[in-house]
Amino acid sequence: MEKFKDNRELNRRSVKDQLANMELLADCIRAEEENGNERYNFLLKGYSQETKEHKPDHAACSAIKEDNSPNKITEKRICRCMNYYSKELAQCKNCKLERKFQNAGKNYFAAEYEVPTKYVIHRVGRIDLVIKDARSGVEYAAEINLPKKNSETLTRMIAEILTYTAGMLDKYKPAICFFEGSTQYKDFCNDAIRSDENFQYLLTQVDVFYITYTENDGIVDYVIHNHKEEPLW
């Protein structure tokens, strides 16, 4: 049985297809609520869930070596660097990663990355990044994409993070996060998408963060913004 988030149709990129998929996801959530079920039950259908609890198992960053593709940028590498980077740390000074990500903001910061679901669930991955509000202490579990060369749709991002946080909503608020200028950023600002009633409904289910950044001498100074506080539209 195909899992909702793994449906290839969710990544169709035309605006017409994106709007149709947003309607599909929104209708599924509404139907669960109307039937008195947990909102995101349908996202877990077809998964085998064990009672064994997951525990984060990644070690502290030990720096990227010269022979380990230092110019390769992946979601995991970005999130790990956002979580650990400090220009004062010896491993960061010795790290060969071509671009290092340094938080230049005050309100939000990366608190953890690659967080597993509460229980082992077959074929369900990990939460990319935990974003923490430095003022309130609220933590957001965020699905994040690369700044460039990533065509994932907003619907797929929302479906993924709602899948990963099912059963963890007492700890994390689900969110999506994208970089300024990315494909997802442009989709979010698209007039037809942002005015769609189903998309507006989905935005009541997740928070939205966007990242602005500047790069100088291999250091990416980034700031995490909350769309509710600093609206893009």
Per-region residue spans from a language model:
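Charged, terminal alpha-helix-loop-beta segments
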Residues: 1-233
